[in-house]
Amino acid sequence: ISITNHRLAVAHEAIDSGLYETLQFPFSYLAGEQEMALVRGCREKNMGFIAMKGLSGGLITNSAAAYAFEAQYDGVLPIWGVQREKELDEFLSYIDNPPRMNEELKAVIDHDRAELCGEFCRGCGYCMPCPAGIEINNCARMSLLLRRSPSAAQLSPEGQAKMKKIEGCLHCNQCKAKCPYG
């Protein structure tokens, strides 16, 4: 039996309960000490750890760095959110030639951590639905998505129309109340 969630308190309860064989939780090289503690807790309780959002919803663009980071943790099995065939080919190539952590990949990780760590939307969608029809999980990450992923979809008339809905925000804070990251 496994459990999946995005809330630290629930994850700790699951580990402490002894009822589960695995925990599925967001974990990438943007993870903080709280997520690292979950990995350690699972290892101590002989639980597997399934790392979802290993590419942080598309914000991490260097798959070799992501793979090398995850490979450092015994008992962690990542789920790669592959969106393009090119990405699938990259991960398939790692079966025979897995990336190992080195200074070059550490530099990539350090750069991304400096740019992305802290308060950012992970794109989980727990904030949805919005009573004003705002696609919060994409709108909240738009500045990062424009810099770090192909931008054609975001800059299309449809993408711009979705962003325009922000002007109709009701400021009801339902999204904040539902966000598992605070």
Locations of regions flagged by a protein language model:
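Glycine/proline-rich, positively charged
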Residues: 1-37, 43-50, 55-58
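Structured C-terminal cap/extension of enzyme domains
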Residues: 37-182
